[in-house]
């Protein structure tokens, strides 16, 4: 997927979101937003922000490279829409700014480095809003995926004392995508979730082996544990 295609998808997503006036209608009567647990409400907007604990997995280096997570953060907006009548299933998407970081231990071939990557991300998940016996409290397991495009970042090379872009033909590819799974909890307008992203794309650039591992013939994939707070 090219950057132009990704930006076009973002534009279509934003223009497709209806303007919410804080209420919906059920059988001709207004349903106000004070109780978000009521799955008769057809849509919602939300603000999301939280912590990333990312991983970068190397395979095919004649022994996996040792990496350590560098916690970062994410922030963005989401929009959810109910699927059908009478069922508490919601399709949620949005636009998230997210940062990921990894520390790569030095080897005979590679110097010690820290990589910080910045992405614009589109999550697409199916949520099931399960009402509980407690008023205004729901449990919301979800499953879906994400698409992300790198928009910047920094790789710090400690031996040579230089900084370079983390993306390029001899570094990481900009595009990433994968599976997202987790569970959220909501009380009235307040939301919390924990989730995990499993990157399915090989993000190693086409010339990665020429500048890093001599015997590299494998893959680099991402993972990301997320803890998120929000307001709907």
Regions found by a protein language model. Give the residues of each.
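Short glycine/proline- and aromatic-enriched beta-strand/turn motifs that initiate or cap beta-hairpins
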Residues: 21-74, 78
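Predominantly the C-terminal beta-signal and adjacent terminal strand-loop region
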Residues: 96, 100, 176-232
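Residues that define the transmembrane beta-barrel architecture of outer-membrane proteins
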Residues: 41-45, 67-73, 116-122, 137, ...
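Short loop/turn motifs that connect adjacent beta-strands in outer-membrane beta-barrel proteins
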Residues: 33-42, 83-89, 131-138
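Outer-membrane beta-barrel translocator domains and adjoining extracellular loop/strand segments
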Residues: 57-63, 103-110, 153-162, 204-211
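Transmembrane beta-barrel strands of outer-membrane/channel proteins
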Residues: 47-53, 93-99, 126, 141-149, ...
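Transmembrane beta-strands of outer-membrane beta-barrel proteins
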Residues: 43-49, 73, 89-93, 122, ...
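Transmembrane beta-barrel domains of outer membrane proteins
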Residues: 36-37, 76-82, 125-129, 182-186, ...
């Amino acid at each position: 997927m090219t950057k132009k295609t990704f930006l076009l998808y973002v534009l279509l997503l934003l223009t497709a979101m209806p303007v919410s006036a804080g209420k919906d209608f059920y059988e001709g009567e207004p349903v106000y937003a004070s109780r978000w647990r009521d799955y008769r409400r057809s849509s919602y907007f939300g603000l999301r922000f939280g912590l990333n604990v990312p991983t970068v997995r190397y395979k095919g280096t004649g022994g996996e490279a040792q990496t350590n997570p560098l916690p970062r953060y994410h922030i963005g907006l989401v929009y959810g829409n109910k699927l059908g009548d009478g069922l508490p299933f919601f399709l949620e998407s949005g636009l998230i700014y997210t940062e990921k970081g990894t520390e790569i231990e030095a080897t005979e071939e590679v110097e010690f480095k820290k990589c910080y990557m910045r992405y614009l991300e589109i999550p697409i998940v199916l949520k099931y809003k399960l009402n509980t016996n407690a008023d205004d409290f729901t449990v919301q397991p979800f499953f879906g995926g994400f698409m992300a495009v790198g928009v910047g970042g920094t790789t710090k090379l400690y031996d040579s004392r230089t900084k370079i872009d983390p993306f390029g033909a001899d570094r990481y590819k900009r595009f990433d995508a994968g599976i997202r799974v987790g569970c959220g909890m909501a009380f009235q307008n307040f939301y919390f979730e924990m989730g995990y992203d499993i990157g399915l794309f090989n993000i190693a650039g086409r010339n990665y082996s020429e500048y890093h591992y001599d015997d590299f013939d494998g893959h680099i994939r991402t993972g990301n544990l997320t803890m998120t707070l929000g307001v709907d």
